[in-house]
């Protein structure tokens, strides 16, 4: 079996990754950068975000300050690798979002964010079927269930259980807080538009913390967000307690 090791950029994690590499090779695994069967992630949820989007199964070692989804502790890595050899694991799948405009094509594990580029409010709309919801504030987040545990949680203090087939729309610091958050089915298509503010708006589009492009109102750009056909896959060897790691 071919393993790729993806490590958090910290001295402790890098040193631990050397130990894991030797351990895996001694157990008969082949370490590779290309076409792996499993990606072994050493870090926290931020490291996971950078490794998970290709849909290759993830073996995650909790080596970060906070991790809600990586459940293998460093002292259990040998046991996990031995279980991997014996195919004694389950695969947990997580939904991802796809966002497209004429200049943007991205996949997000946690969330898509539309945020101001300058220190002023964003005036726009979220369109779902025939329903148009206007908003003005710092922006809007479109989050998966696992994404509701992250940035969206900071704004709403609401957690969406991973088994709920929903998408959470969060309005960030709205001027008129008539709607703070909205949960819709994952089957819906979401269209985000910039509305007429009397001057050109230029806002950032952010996918899992990375700026992937801009929307400009004068060009009448729209961002379409749908459920991706691609699933993130995380291998489970032990029981993961829901929401464990979020508050510690």
Curated annotation (Swiss-Prot):
Its cofactor is a divalent metal cation. This is NAD kinase. Transmembrane segments: none annotated. It catalyses: NAD(+) + ATP = ADP + NADP(+) + H(+). NAD(+) binds at residues 45-46, 50, 110-111, 138. One of its GO terms (biological process) is NADP biosynthetic process. The active site is at residue 45. Its EC number is 2.7.1.23. Belongs to the NAD kinase family.
């Amino acid at each position: 079996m071919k393993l790729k090791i993806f490590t958090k950029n910290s001295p402790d994690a890098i040193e631990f990754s050397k130990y894991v590499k030797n351990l895996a090779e001694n157990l008969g695994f082949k370490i590779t950068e290309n076409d792996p069967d499993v990606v072994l992630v050493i870090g926290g949820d931020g490291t996971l975000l950078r490794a998970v989007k290709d849909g290759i199964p993830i073996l995650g070692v909790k080596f970060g300050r906070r991790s809600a989804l990586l459940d293998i502790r460093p002292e259990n890595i040998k046991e996990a690798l031995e279980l991997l050899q014996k195919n004694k694991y389950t695969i947990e799948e997580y939904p991802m979002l796809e966002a497209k405009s004429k200049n943007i094509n991205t996949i997000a594990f946690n969330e898509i964010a539309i945020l101001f580029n300058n220190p002023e409010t964003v005036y726009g709309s979220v369109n779902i079927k025939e329903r148009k919801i206007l908003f003005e504030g710092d922006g809007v987040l479109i989050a998966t269930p696992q994404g509701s545990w992250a940035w969206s949680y900071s704004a709403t203090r609401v957690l969406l259980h991973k088994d709920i087939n929903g998408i959470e729309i969060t309005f960030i610091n709205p001027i008129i807080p008539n709607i703070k958050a909205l949960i819709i089915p994952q089957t819906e298509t979401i269209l985000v538009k910039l509305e007429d503010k009397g001057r050109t708006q230029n806002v950032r589009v952010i996918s899992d913390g990375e700026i992937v492009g801009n929307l400009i109102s004068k060009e009448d750009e729209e961002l379409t967000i749908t459920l991706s056909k691609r699933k993130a896959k995380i291998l489970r060897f032990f029981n993961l307690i829901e929401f464990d790691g979020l508050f510690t």
